[in-house]
């Protein structure tokens, strides 16, 4: 076969400089630098890209990485270019605080929009401290931080007018009001994820925001140290709370049709009226939701509570996704008995109950008469088919049923 002659000039190199820089911005800085050997046209393009995406493992040490950042930033400053995105995978074991703060201050002043710092070391003494300039970055839109420390700021110096997304994992806050201050001074914040450092000793996590649409909290701390949680975000469309044993969980306001995922655990003790009152308030707040995903350990806590106090009516609940993984069927009916208007039910099981268990703990009549959709996520066994048959015969309004594996 005859070989087709190829032009010495590729079409990609004919593109305007700003388009080539946009293409390079989707690569890591290391990969972007490698393109400099393609041709004279590409030799300097990587240095014009508005993104720095660095991995400490690509350098001999922090000094070399620091010199690279300084050189890149100085060149950008000479040309009057903005740095839109700064991503750093970092080893705080080799960390020098003052040079780090100085460089991060430069990044903030260059009008950064996306800031992502991942410290690979999560021990307390190696956490990276954030500079004060970060609290008043007018251009910042997305803030993603792993294993860092926020010192207590002066409230008047905090202003994050453009931030829409915050993701904090393994983060320590120097004082209960630090996180609340960051949230309250971010007027357009839409998405917030908080996974505190296991050795962070916050007593209160307070989320008050008029603009927030999505909030996820996952606590990995020891149960005796878990904080109080308060939510007041009327625009919230999605909320996920995973906290082993929160001191308290108060939900003042969220969006009327928010999808809520709850994975919490409470101690139910007959001789502790304060604990019983706390659980009651939590359940009353939970009863206002329309769509709810609930974990096995939360169902177990509700089941235990039902033995010592009445459950509130969940008349607003129309959709429920209930997990019984590593749990038993008997914990579910107590909660279902309060769901008089339930329209959609998803049950996740790792062990399908036998009919004898269901007869001892039957599905309440209010659910059998209101249910329109049912999905059973469980291993394929004869018991699963019997459970499906049970629902099909008992449910008077059921129009759709799905059977699936886990």
Swiss-Prot record:
Residues 355-405 form the FBD domain. It holds the Pfam family LRR_At5g56370. PROSITE patterns: FBOX. Residues 9-59 form the F-box domain. InterPro entries: F-box-like_dom_sf, F-box_AtFBL13-like, F-box_dom, FBD, FBL13/AtMIF1-like, LRR_FXL15/At3g58940/PEG3-like. This is FBD-associated F-box protein At1g60410.
